[in-house]
Amino acid sequence: MSLLLLGAASQVNAAEDHSVISAELLPTSLQTSWQVNKPQLGKFGHCAAAFDSRTDDSKMAFACSIYVKLEAVAQRKAIQHCDEQRAARNIKAPCQLIK
């Protein structure tokens, strides 16, 4: 039983390691994307974003993980999808979870 609890605790800690950004601090186009996706997030969904420019959409990445049953999974998938976009667009800034 204690092994199971340790595993769950490590998953929670891993989920908390992602940096977070307030939606108000995002560039306008990312704020719009956030507002469009926010109602669909449900209890566990998360979105992540990265940007090197506040005006050039080609220097922005945005991804959400919506249909999941665990918050840690949603966080991890949102960051993963954002990182894929970030790499494809050569964005230097790290992906951050949006709160």
Predicted regions and their residues:
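Secreted/extracellular ectodomain signature
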Residues: 12-99
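Sec-dependent signal peptide recognition
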Residues: 1-3
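N-terminal signal peptide c-region/cleavage motif recognized by signal peptidases
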Residues: 7-9
